[in-house]
Amino acid sequence: MSVIVVAEFPMTEQGAQDFIDWSKNADGYVITRQHKGFEDIRTFLAEDKKTVYLYEKWDSKEDHQAYLSFRVENGLMDFLNPRLDGDFKVTYFSEE
């Protein structure tokens, strides 16, 4: 059964736009879509123009965590840290 992942990123307004731009380039979701277990990803920008939400669907929590590890090892936090305006949060949900 698939797992739903919701990630919340509190960012500066410019940081949110940088993240959205990054997601659309060759280093963004193009790579995400190639990972084992990937099913879907959608990006939402809150009304404050600073909080980015990701809605993701993966085959399993383990597949998503392996993907996150890959991203961290390849410099994602170096990109995110100067743009974040607080701690980001990842929550896992099961479909009932």
Model-derived segments and spans:
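An amphipathic, aromatic/His-enriched active-site/gating alpha helix that lines ligand/cofactor pockets
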Residues: 25-39, 57-91
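Non-catalytic surface loops within mature trypsin-like serine protease
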Residues: 11-13, 60, 94-96
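Short, well-ordered beta-strand segments in beta-rich or mixed alpha/beta enzyme
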Residues: 3-10, 39-68
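Absolute protein N-terminus
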Residues: 1-2, 96
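Short, surface-exposed ligand-recognition loops at beta-strand->loop->(often short) alpha-helix junctions
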Residues: 10-23
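Solvent-exposed beta-strand sheet faces enriched in polar/charged residues
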Residues: 44, 91-93
